[in-house]
Amino acid sequence: MGLADRTVRKMNSAFDGEDYGSEDGLIFCETEADARERLSRSAGKVLLVSDETACSAFAAIASHPRALSVVFDGDCLPLFSMPDGVSYVLASGGSEVLHAARYFAEVRGIGCTVYPALATLEGAYELKGTLQLGGERTQVPLAECSVVCDVQRLKGAFARGYARLLLTRLANFETRALSAFGIGQGAEPLPSFPETGEEDILRENANARLRERFAPVGEGATLAKLLDACGKPVPEWQAYLQLTSLYAAFFEKGKPRRYFTPDYRARAERAGTDYNLAGVPTAEEYVFRAMALERVRARFAREALSFVKEREAHCEKLSAWEQVSLHGGDLTFLKRLPEYEPHGLSAVIRDFGLMEWEL
C-alpha cells in the first residue's frame, strides 16, 4: 500500500479545492511563498504559531492585517484566547508547536498547515498528542493538516531525519523480536533502506509516521526523546548506536540470570516512574521467554550484528549533514529505558537480569 493510500486528507472551506501536493501527501515549497498564498486565500484571520527557533518563518507575513502571530511558550491554553474569526492556522517549529496548532484547529473546526522544523516530521501526522493545558498535561485529539516541507529551511535537520529512519528499521526488528517472546503481533520485515536524497528522507519519514498511527513506534524513539531533552546532538543517532549494541550483545551472548530478580521498585524510583507499570513477567512468561531466546538467538543475532556492521557507513552519510561519531555517549537513559518503555525489548533484557551494569 502506498503512502497516498494511508493519508487521511481533510478539505476545508477556507481553501476550497486545496492542493495537497504530490501523491504521497507532502508539499515541497518555500515556507514564505506557501504561507503567503494561504493567507491570501483565507476567508478570515489566520493564526501564525511558531516557537522561538522558527518564528522567522512567518516574518514576511506577520504584519498582514489578517494575520495573528503567537510565539508558543509550551502552554496551549492561551491559544484559545484568540478572537473569533480565525479561519485557518499555520504552524512552524518542532513537534509540540505543531501539536498545539493542530489541536487548536481540531477544537475550532478549521484548517491547518504545518511547516515542520524537523526532518523526522514528528508532530505532523500523529492522531493524538500530549499538551500542557494550564496546570496539567493532557492527551488531546489532533486535526489532519497539510504538511509543507521547505528543503532549504530543513538543511540543518536531515541528519536527524536520516537517523530517525534507522530507528524505524530498528523498531521493526524490535517488534519481530518481541513477537518471538510472545509479546505483540509481530511485523513483516521492512524493504531495503531508502535512497538518501533529502526529499527521499522526508517522504520515508512521512511514510513511517503514518504507519506509526497503527503500529509500534519502538523504544528507540523514546530513548531519542530522552536524549534530546538533555540537549544531546542528533539524539536519534545516539539512540541507534546504543540500542544496536545492546540488541547485538543480548542475542549474541546474553544468558538469563536464572536466580536473579531485578529490584523493580528501586529501578522505578531511579527513573522516576510508577513501579506498578513495570510489567513484571510471571514465572511462566519468564520460562517461555528463556526457552524462546535459545530458539531464535542465532537468527536475531545475525540481524542485530548486521546493524552494527552497517553503522560506519551510516555515520559517513550522516556526517554529510552534521558531524557525528560512532561513540554512543551517556548510557544512563539506556539503562533506565525499560522503566520508560515497559513493553519494549529492553524490558525483556532487564527481566533476564542483563540491564544491571555499572554506569
Model-derived regions: residue spans:
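A short, small-residue-rich loop immediately preceding and capping a beta-strand
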Residues: 82-118
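ATP/NTP phosphate-donor binding region
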Residues: 1-88, 157, 164-167
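C-terminal charged capping/lid subdomain of soluble metabolic enzymes
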Residues: 2-13, 256-359
